From Swiss-Prot:
NDH-1 can be composed of about 15 different subunits; different subcomplexes with different compositions have been identified which probably have different functions. The keyword Nucleotide-binding does not apply. It is a multi-pass membrane protein. This is NAD(P)H-quinone oxidoreductase subunit L. It is found in: Cellular thylakoid membrane. The gene is ndhL.
């Protein structure tokens, strides 16, 4: 069985991974899909979440691309 301090450390590590990697990735995917179709209040929420998850955005954003899809001519 794990000691209390080990469980606390694992909990902190899990929360750090969730805050710095998982939630910013999911949020960036959501913003990519909804940006052109969202209303004013939804964009306010998006801006708030960008500020809230800013450290994770700095870590995750360089690995994502938001280039437009190629057009068919």
């Amino acid at each position: 069985m794990l000691s209390t301090s080990t469980l606390i450390g694992l909990t902190y590590a899990a929360l750090a991974v969730l805050y710095l990697l998982v939630l910013p990735f999911l949020f960036l995917v959501y913003v990519d899909k909804r940006w052109n179709y969202s209303g004013a209040w939804e964009k306010v929420l998006m801006f708030f979440l960008v500020l809230f998850f800013f450290p994770g955005m700095v870590l995750v954003a360089p690995f994502m691309t938001f280039r437009p899809k190629p057009r068919s001519l």
